[in-house]
Amino acid sequence: APDGMAMDEAYSFEWDVAYLAAVDAGDRSPDLWHRLAEKPFSPLYFFYRQSPRKLIAANRDGMVRADDPPVDMSGMAEVVLTPRGQLRTFLSVPPQRETGGGPWPEPDFRALLRETGLDGSALRPAAPQWASPVDSDRKAAWEGTHGTGDDAVPIRVEAAAYHGRPVWLAVLPPWM
């Protein structure tokens, strides 16, 4: 698309099936489903996808989803948010061809971390463990908890950058 503009986009709400399975396996209290709104994670998420080409899903109903079609073409991007607007995943596919040489600036993940709604002062730097889903030359990670009291959940935040620009950030609860 000219000037980096998206040619196609899609957005929708989807159920977080992995989260629902984890909650169902771990909490058998009778009021569980009524208390989900109070828990730090949501069983529902919003995704937004954009692409420099038409998004064509491979699934039977033809609906674009968070994972269909794959986010694998330069210029494609995806954002996943909670119903409250907190960032859970950011993904931006970098160019397929190298454009000049470094050195590249250190990536600044602070803006993305702020958008997660997590308490940044409670996150501790950690060694990255996850592979970035897109090409990257720098990675970072943090550990902490999300929520309070009995509902507190240990989390990891993993991030990656390409040539100084963030290309991936994911808030990863233990069931991921």
Regions found by a protein language model. Name each.
Residues A1-M176:
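Soluble extramembrane regions of membrane proteins in the secretory/endomembrane system
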